[in-house]
Amino acid sequence: MCKSAIYVVNTAAQSVAVGGTIALGSAIRRFGCAVNLNGNSVLLDEAGYYTVDVSIVAAPTTAGTVTATLFNNGVAVPGATASAAVSTAGNPVNLSFESMVRVGCNGNTGVLNVVLTGTASTVTNIAEVVTKI
């Protein structure tokens, strides 16, 4: 049984530049005290392991490959990335990935962000679930 969880969603269209952080919107569901939404970040406030599930709809502004990557404390989480290639600008693509991150002991915290790379895009949906296990 998990101690804490948060479900954040942003369905407002947002223009995200290459290297930009995707705005997470608002918390739809939350329980416990180990995970919190702070602006465009999910904060992990207790030591332990957390699962992270991310789903994104993005429409690249130019043809190319759009990539979304999870960052923890400013560092890309290995394997927590999804990419899709489009041949026509404006075609929406679905990106999703799952990951697990760890917050160490001794007062450490985690700060999770989702960063867009590859090609600038209009993001019309992002949903993120973070669960302390």
Protein language model regions, located:
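Extracellular jelly-roll beta-sandwich "head" domains, especially the C-terminal globular C1q domain
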Residues: 1-133
